[in-house]
Amino acid sequence: WERLPIWARTEILDKKIRVFTLPGFEIARKATNRADLQLRMQGNAFLGAFFKVSPLLQDFDINNDQFEEVVRNQYQKKFGKLGSAVIESNMEVMTQGFSRVTEIKVGEITAADRSTLRGLPMLPLSALPPAELGEGCATCRSHPLPEGQAERTPVTQVGVFDSEFRSDYGYDQPASPLAAMSVMAAGTGDTASKYVARRETPLFIPENCTQCMECISVCPDTALPNCSQDIETVLRTAINNYVESVDDRAKLNAHVPEIEKRTRSLMNDAVGGKADTPFPELVREATSGLNGFSDTSRSQFLSIIEQAPVAYNKVNAIFKGPEKKNPGSGGVFSIFVSDLCKGCAACVTACGDHDALRMVAETESVNAEHETGTAFLDLLPDTEQKFLGFYNDEHPVDSKTATLRNHLMVRRNYDALVSGDGACAGCGEKSVLRAIASITEAYMRPLYHAKADRFSQKAGELRQGGVALLAALAALHPEQHQLFVRTVAHTIMGLGGDSEKDTDVRLEQHGPISDEDIVDALATVLEQESFNHKDLQALDGRLDNGQCVMAMAAHTGCNTVYGSTPPNNPHPYPWMNSLFQDGATIGWLFGESFMVDHARRSVIPERLADTLINKLGESMTAQDYYDYTHFSDNLMTDEEIKELPKVWIVGGDGGMGDIGYQNVSKVMLQNRPNVKAVMLDTQVYSNTGGQNSDSTPMLGGSDMNSFGAATQGKGVEKKTVAETFLAGHGSPFVSQISIANAPKFFRAILDGLEYRGTGFLQCFTTCQPEHGVADDMALDQAQRVRDSRGAPEFVFNPTLGETYEEALDLKGNPHSDKDWYTTKFKSTGEKYRYTVAHWCATEARFRNHLKRIKDESKIKDLISLENMLIRITQQDVVHRYHLNPEHRAFVPDFGVFAKVPGPDGKPQVVALSRQLVLFCVERRKAWRLLQSKAGIVNKEYIAQRTLLVDVDSGTVSKEELFARAEELFEERLLGSPAAVPA
């Protein structure tokens, strides 16, 4: 009762509403050990609870046995193919919900109000207590509009949007231009809270952190903001913002050099002795002998230090390494957990055995601790270059690839996608979108600021001496002066017409144009562009560090549902969705318009300014005038192209690989320099219920697939969209990449941005509900599908050469010269070859294709997968020899077995469907084609080819092949010729 808000209590009492509670999540967790089902099955508990408390059963005279029989029959229809155990577990959850639903006791309306479900955070002195805050201000950004920037139009203001969509109108939502035009303010998810959406939350253990950045790279929800700081900065931030007494604040600040020195000494001792002493304990010890200020102030200072998550013990690149090279230079590293977290636990899984993050139950006290931490973070400066190692914040392209994760230590990059949206917990798409946004911000923002400084300087030079320079030009070369004035009037002052005659008329109507007018026009445009690129506040309340560096055009799909459903969208930049298939062409239009604006507002004004300032007396010809008045990207330098705002086309494998494929193909062929595309490859129509796409594996596996005697899934080879752009599409930059390898992923994005042409990235993205995996598995599944050759990594960079061998890079795939990657079972050390069958065994969507064999004595009647794969090629499948019992390539349905890692890591034997074996063959063939393009000689392919030539010619009998396939294969492999036999 105390957790219900006053308005709800009032309505409950007035309307005599009965209120019930149900421990649905607890019930579901006890019913299954599958993490992906433990939260989702609570819906079955609600089903039972609903029928228990509603009058339906009583009104229709249905007893409990009849009710359970009806429900069981429905479960039989839905889950019967999965076996009786699945039906019984669902029945157990339902009946538990029926029996455990409890009516709460209605209390007094004046009872204590704990409806926020939150504890009280420790806030800085500048922040008012929650009770004194205006509605919505507790989480709002506080940066004012910069001087010289006009107020935004109402349709783009977050406040106006919130007044309509965050004001509890419900079904009484008023009609407005926002709704009529389907317009949202940008980045509204920034002020959202996911507190009620998560059951558990990650807890940061600083003493175990190594600053590997893996957790931060995989987090889909911008929920792990982080930074590195000098020790002194942390100490002074705590003193200046949390110690109330002004006098004591000054005294403590005077002691900071001594506190910092003592703390650093203790830190060095702890690191040298490999101790895990927490940072707050060291600060407490360092201040223990200091006096001259009150105990209250000491307590206030130490209290916030205890709440601030500070790591030093194992963050060698931040503390130990710098300290060793230059004593006194080591810093500290912090990870904060924000209220945007959905509790997916992807970060905890990525952290793994480091144990620097642990999932804990979300409680009022844990929430208060996290809110305290993020409030402290907002007071800290951004991470300095000295803590970023070989990541170059001013020139990210020059960074070492292994350090590219460090770009996420810079807050302006980290906040490039704000999250707060309604994407599923752990959504693999979000991790990719966040990387796209953060890398683009990291790449473009320094270019913008350098451009702004350059423009500001040139505008100043024009203001100071431009008129005199024009007068000198008129005296020396009157024709060039006249042509220069005409060019500025035409391109900058808006007096150009559709033809020479039209322009002449416009100029005559305007009247005389003085040299002062020309200089003022050029300088004004340069000054405005300088402001726009460095000082403009693009979004309400956010940093005033320049206009957006990118825009996004989206194909309809999951990304547009969570990307544009009021009230929370994650995009702090221009974003548009039109139709399912036309995101690519919309993005192309964006790119063209950006190039026109860039030419008119930046390139042409700067070039004309340079002509006047640096090239006085050089010829200004009629051809120059023509070029300026018919300007295009063909005339831009590489540097001018880099400074172009970028466009990212985004969509799923359905929108971009199926129905919208022709649009994407068209855009790739144009090779526009600022248009890039990323396909979020969930391998299924995730948003519309699980239909197959061309990118869906041969197994199908989605909700819309049938499995039985007539069909075992999709049955068609997988289309890898990225591979189709390696030929016949001009010269685009192409990559198939994912968060499986974050540094290489970030590098591919950077190289795509650098490339003067269209870029395309195909990124495998886990869809937890459609793939049947737990919320924390996006990283693991991306690695598994890569390692299995299901979605191998590659980068095709045309700048490297005009042959596939030069331009195509397969680095990052394990054992890239082999058919399959060889690994070991963790529990036994036994080696095995990791095929797509092994990846499929980890996703519930493929469960129909694998049957567990508990009695391993039965495998004597089955064929090992290794043996079977030696017997068969893709051409055997094309000719349907796999269906001929007399042929060497015959694949018996569930007559092939493999050992796969079980849930406990131990090997377990499974029989494979015929379709799964064919999927292995198909993926091997696709991988071999990639290898050949990259110039990699696969001796295993040669060995298999030579062996099968001998079998088909009768030199080796079919019986011997069946009995000794692996042995014969190894013999051929050891003596493998250098070329494939004809």
Where are each of the predicted segments found?
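Active-site cofactor/cluster-binding pocket
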Residues: 1-140, 567, 691-692, 701-708, ...
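Short internal beta-strands
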Residues: 1-2, 555, 676-681
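Acidic, Ser/Thr-rich peripheral helices and adjacent loops at domain boundaries
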Residues: 1-13, 370-400, 572-574, 693-718, ...
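Conserved thiamine diphosphate
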Residues: 16-19, 410-411, 415, 604, ...
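Thiamine diphosphate
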Residues: 101, 214-218, 430-435, 535-538, ...
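Flexible, low-complexity linker and terminal segments
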Residues: 137-160, 186, 196-225, 233-237, ...
